[in-house]
């Protein structure tokens, strides 16, 4: 964000005279800290893992924010080490509690679902396809649905379709495109699979847990491995297609285990209820504003 953008923001700051500013990304914080000398306190949010911002020059201004808010507790130390931030806390995203009618009465399909941006490097849906290929003969009545925007990376979409064709899995694996009813789509599935190498705070994964669908992801995946607790609300696979396939198989062949992990996932997500998260934010805002009030003689 450059000086021109700062000029766009300036009238609003001068007009409203805010008690505090929340920058939703480091670029915004850079603009405000660099071009506004007489400013209210600023809180900078990071909506991904701190390492994801390493190539952004604007992160040099993070240390000038009054507080940096990250999504998970383990990110607090990371942001301190990477960017010299001294004041950092974690506040997660809010996850809406879903009505029991969405998941208690619905008939579960023998479906493994992946809802994520379709990306070779960031989400690696091809690993799910390769893992399922190891299982399809043993579980011919199971299917895989890959949901995500198909317009962003047409080359990778073509690669996935070619892989499905080569493996002879057209009848069992479907690339579905986008949906505006994520929770409802996930709720009818039996397993949520996310083969990402890293995450910030994966919302679709949380929505899966919130409707009682157990998750399979990689143990090494930051973000996901904080939310998924092995053999409690999902399974954590080691870094190989074979291990991912084994975790899928463990759930595919054990409906009672799927139900047990699903129930725990619903309970776990209650900690992220909106009212709890907004209360945390309200407390943080009050504290930061109070710390910057002029001291009375």
Residue ranges, per PLM feature:
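Short His-centered aromatic/hydrophobic patch
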Residues: 2-5, 23-29
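Carbohydrate-associated surface elements
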Residues: 74, 94
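A conserved mid-protein helix/loop that constitutes part of the nucleotide-sugar donor-binding site
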Residues: 110, 119-137, 144, 158
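Glycosyltransferase donor-sugar binding loop
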Residues: 115, 143-158
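Nucleotide-activated donor-binding/catalytic signature segment of Leloir-type glycosyltransferases, i.e.
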Residues: 157-177
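Aromatic "clamp/platform" in nucleotide-sugar-dependent glycosyltransferases that forms part
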Residues: 178, 197
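Short hydrophobic beta-strand element within catalytic cores of glycosyltransferases
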Residues: 214-218
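Conserved acidic donor-binding segment of nucleotide-sugar-dependent glycosyltransferases
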Residues: 219, 229-231, 235-242, 250-255
């Amino acid at each position: 964000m450059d000086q021109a953008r700062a000029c766009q923001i300036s009238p609003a700051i001068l007009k409203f005279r805010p008690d505090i500013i929340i920058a939703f990304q480091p670029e915004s914080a850079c603009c405000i800290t660099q071009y506004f000398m007489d400013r209210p306190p600023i809180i900078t949010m990071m909506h991904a893992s701190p390492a994801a911002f390493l190539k952004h020059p604007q992160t040099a201004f993070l240390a000038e924010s009054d507080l940096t808010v990250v999504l998970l507790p383990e990110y607090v130390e990371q942001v301190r080490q990477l960017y010299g931030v001294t004041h950092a806390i974690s506040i997660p995203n809010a996850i809406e509690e879903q009505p029991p009618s969405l998941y208690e009465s619905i008939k579960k399909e023998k479906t493994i679902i992946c809802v994520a941006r379709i990306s070779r490097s960031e989400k690696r849906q091809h690993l799910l396809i390769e893992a399922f290929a190891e299982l399809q003969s043993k579980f011919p009545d199971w299917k895989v649905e890959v949901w995500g925007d198909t317009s962003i990376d047409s080359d990778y979409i073509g690669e996935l379709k070619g892989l499905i064709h080569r493996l002879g899995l057209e009848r069992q694996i479907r690339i579905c495109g986008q949906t505006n009813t994520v929770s409802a789509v996930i709720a009818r599935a039996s397993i949520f699979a996310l083969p990402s190498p890293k995450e910030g705070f994966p919302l679709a994964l949380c929505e899966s847990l919130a409707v009682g669908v157990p998750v399979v992801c990689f143990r090494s995946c930051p973000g996901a491995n904080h939310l998924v607790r092995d053999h409690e609300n999902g399974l954590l696979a080691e870094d190989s297609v074979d291990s991912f396939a084994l975790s899928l198989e463990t759930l595919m062949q054990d409906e009672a285990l799927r139900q047990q992990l699903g129930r725990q996932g619903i309970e776990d997500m209650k900690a992220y209820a909106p009212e709890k998260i907004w209360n945390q934010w309200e407390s943080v805002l009050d504290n930061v504003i109070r710390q910057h009030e002029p001291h009375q003689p």
